[in-house]
């Protein structure tokens, strides 16, 4: 349910962009993200840091997009969110407390080296997405950027999450099979 809730603002943004324009879509994105945070808090009594960072960035850069009638701000929002996530993971790694382990470590027992590898992999993923977003945003038409933002980055994140899951599975402690006596 929570994962579905995370996609609703993105779906609304895409639909309103296709029917109207980037400014209507951006206004709706701000409103939908605000409602999403409120509903998440009402249902779970907490809001995750990543969701709060995304909300603040949507409100800030979306607001600037609308106030200045300049779609460059909403384009930059995507890159800045990814850079913030990459920096957060980098800082957590340097401090010896990989954020990925903090998020998943209660459910999974893995060696510290594995957590470190996963953490650095996500740093690289977020950094790559940030750079790729800038390229698409400023070298291709707005329609292409919107499709990339909604479908390309979503698909890349899904694939990378699955790859991370496979890497985790490979390193999970497996109980030896017992022989029937």
Curated annotation (Swiss-Prot):
Its main location: membrane. The chain crosses the membrane at residues 10-30, 50-70, 80-100, 120-140, 148-168. It is a multi-pass membrane protein. InterPro entries: YciB. It is found in: Cell inner membrane. Keywords: Cell inner membrane, Cell membrane, Membrane, Transmembrane, Transmembrane helix. Pfam families: IspA. One of its GO terms (cellular component) is plasma membrane. HAMAP family: YciB (MF_00189). Belongs to the YciB family. Plays a role in cell envelope biogenesis, maintenance of cell envelope integrity and membrane homeostasis. NCBIfam families: ispZ, PRK00259.1-2, PRK00259.1-3. This is Inner membrane-spanning protein YciB. It comes from Vibrio cholerae serotype O1 (strain ATCC 39315 / El Tor Inaba N16961).
């Amino acid at each position: 349910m929570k994962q579905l809730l995370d996609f609703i603002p993105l779906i609304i943004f895409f639909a309103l962009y296709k029917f109207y324009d980037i400014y209507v879509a951006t206004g709706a994105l701000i409103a939908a993200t605000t409602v999403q945070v409120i509903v998440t808090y009402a249902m779970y009594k907490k809001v995750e840091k990543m969701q709060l960072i995304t909300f603040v960035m949507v409100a800030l850069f979306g607001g600037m997009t609308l106030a200045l009638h300049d779609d460059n701000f909403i384009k930059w929002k995507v890159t800045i969110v990814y850079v913030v996530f990459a920096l957060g993971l980098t800082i957590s790694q340097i401090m010896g407390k990989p954020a990925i382990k903090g998020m998943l470590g209660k459910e999974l027992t893995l060696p510290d080296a594995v957590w470190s590898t996963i953490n650095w992999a996500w740093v690289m993923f977020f950094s790559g997405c940030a750079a790729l977003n800038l390229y698409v945003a400023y070298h291709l038409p707005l329609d292409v950027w919107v499709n990339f933002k909604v479908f390309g980055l979503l698909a890349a994140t899904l694939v990378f999450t699955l790859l991370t899951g496979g890497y985790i599975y490979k390193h999970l402690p497996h109980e030896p099979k017992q022989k029937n006596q």
